[in-house]
Amino acid sequence: MAVRAQFENSNEVGVFSTLTNSYALVAVGASENFYSVFEAELQDVIPICRTTIAGTRIIGRLTAGNRKGLLVPTTTSDQELQHLRNSLPDDVRIQRIEERLSALGNVIVCNDHTALIHPDLERETEEIIADVLGVEVFRQTIADNVLVGSYMALSNQGGLVHPKTSIQDQDELSSLLQVPLVAGSVNRGSNVIGGGMVVNDWMAVTGLDTTAPELSVIESVFRLGEGAAPGQINSSLKDTMVESFY
């Protein structure tokens, strides 16, 4: 299921929200409509937490997370951290990171198995990412951009990358991540994929300007049209994991 939404007249959905397979974060704000888009799809499935990070609403650009964990910048207040701990499932690890490149959502893109990170992140940060999120970590660029989190959206099913990513780079990234990748855009031609959409294994939210062709590319690469629902995804994933293991 791919749906379109706006946060207070902004199409940059990925700036104001974070979506994983075990929780969603949505910025505090007057945009009740934006929150209700998440609520309609996720209400009985995973918790949706309304929050600020470091007193700001650009939570999608400041945080990075997956099913197992959530990374927040060191500027996150104690109250915000406590609110996240109270709202998210107990088995999700929440960790503050002391990192110069503190917009973590711009410099990290991950699913439940792999993370791509900005080439200049601290070695210590890389270790924390691997530990808290339980992923393999690779230092990469996307179409020669170091902001991997801004120019890519990734789930366990597939990934959408910057439209100028070469075929060779797509193949290399695809073999690292072990998921199919497509070069494309969101919000009527925007190449800032990470800022323009959020996705998990059964749902994507994109900006209201996203065109029908863009939406169909998103639905096909992330496999969202195949009767996707949380329960079915897990069983099909388990089957493929078992097959690839043997």
Swiss-Prot record:
GO terms for molecular function: ribosomal large subunit binding; translation initiation factor activity. The modification Phosphoserine is found at residues 174-175. InterPro entries: eIF6. It is found in: Cytoplasm; Nucleus, Nucleolus. It holds the Pfam family eIF-6. Its main location: cytoplasm. One of its GO terms (cellular component) is preribosome, large subunit precursor. Monomer. Associates with the 60S ribosomal subunit. PANTHER family: TRANSLATION INITIATION FACTOR 6. This is Eukaryotic translation initiation factor 6. It comes from Neurospora crassa (strain ATCC 24698 / 74-OR23-1A / CBS 708.71 / DSM 1257 / FGSC 987). The gene is tif-6.
